[in-house]
Design a protein with these regions (language model features):
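Short acidic-aromatic low-complexity motifs
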Residues: 5-35
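Generic detector of low-complexity/intrinsically disordered segments
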Residues: 17-20, 41-43, 105, 109, ...
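A solvent-exposed, acidic/Ser-Thr-rich amphipathic alpha-helical stretch
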Residues: 27-79
Length: 140
């Protein structure tokens, strides 16, 4: 864990926007990650880790090879960084997929040094259709 330092709301919003761009393009913008960034990714029944910017990006590309969109996200500052809640949509040969995720990011020198990501798992088109048929959400 990194040492707690004050993080400005402006920097949190900048990093959240850079992270969303990363999710949508599978390319890490300059200034988003430290060179030795550590990722701890928890999936419904699996856990993966990566160290370093290149490994982080490679893990992302393996799990989400298609570019997508982030229709909604919210960032909240923490003493050591921020928490980002986000949703993703992407399309492949099977159709449009969906997932919801939560990331706790610790910063060092204004960049993400550690990230713990919790993912609902990827909902394929059939799961999305079944959910839409059986569940009425009060909020998107």
């Amino acid at each position: 864990m990194t040492a707690a330092t004050a993080v400005s709301d402006t920097r949190v919003e900048e990093l959240a926007a850079l992270f969303v761009r990363f999710l949508e393009t599978n390319t890490a913008p300059d200034g988003l990650f430290t060179d030795d960034v550590f990722l701890d990714l928890s999936l419904p029944q699996w856990r993966l880790q990566a160290r370093g910017r290149e490994e982080f990006v490679a893990l992302r590309r393996r799990s989400h090879p298609c570019r997508g969109t982030v229709p909604r996200h919210r960032a909240d500052p923490t003493p050591s960084g921020f928490v980002l809640e986000f949703e993703e949509n992407w399309t492949d040969a099977q159709g449009t997929w969906y997932c919801r995720e939560l990331m706790r990011a610790d910063l060092r020198d204004g960049a993400i040094a550690e990230a713990s990501v919790y993912c609902t798992g990827d909902w394929d088109p059939a799961t999305r259709a079944a959910h839409a048929e059986k569940v009425r959400l009060l909020r998107p």
